[in-house]
């Protein structure tokens, strides 16, 4: 097993950071409109039953009583980023995302704008993407297929309109795949659906989020098959990274795996970067995983 190769001198690019914490964390999930059970509706973080030590939450398992009134926006993120050598982080902008907009305006050298459109909005979602790309330097589209109401599967025609625009504007799509943590049906996020999308859109850059479980072996085959398909590690504590993904990165897939965290939604950056030191990536994989692959996918000039 490869151990002890984590580089302390590589500044990371985090492809998933939120902007709100504490009771305001619920606002991170304003787009998750399909929750039905009362227990989930009472949660600040709708998948918190899966996590312990959720930052600034006394609702999750093993809470340590951390204060419930943390700063928000850049004041929340930058101290954690700085002490863990995270140079850049991708955050959400768009309607009802004032914190994200302010973070981009105040710290354009630290935050990367992404946007999660609602495919159910039809042409309006397309117009919003075009406007954000034109006026605000939009770098990526994000998607949570199981989280919409009605749900919009990965291969739905409503998504195809967005994929077509992403190809036109050269925007990558970061899309949740696999069983979702929130208590909504998983069918829209079956990993097998990605295969048809990559076939129909050979110029589309597609990055999976949230693990692709229980179909990790399948996504490994698809990563090998499709040159523009990537995998990001969002929502997984490093000690739980799938072995198949670590093995793939260490063999044929060093260019296809991107670092993504889950701060402050479910994981602390301090915990993530402590646990990363024990992930058995080969030395040559780390710079690509932490930084270089994201720079390439997002077209960054850093």
Where are these regions (language model features)?
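Conserved, mostly hydrophobic/aromatic
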Residues: 16, 81, 132, 166, ...
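Alpha-helical packing segments of well-folded alpha/beta enzyme cores
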Residues: 73-80, 84, 96, 128, ...
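Short, surface-exposed amphipathic charged segments that create phosphate/polyanion-binding patches used
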Residues: 126-132, 246-249, 301
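Active-site neighborhood of phospho(di)ester-bond hydrolases with catalytic His/Asp-centered motifs
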Residues: 12-16, 91-92, 114-115, 206-210, ...
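Mid-to-C-terminal alpha-helical segments outside catalytic/metal-binding sites
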Residues: 1-13, 22-83, 88, 253-258, ...
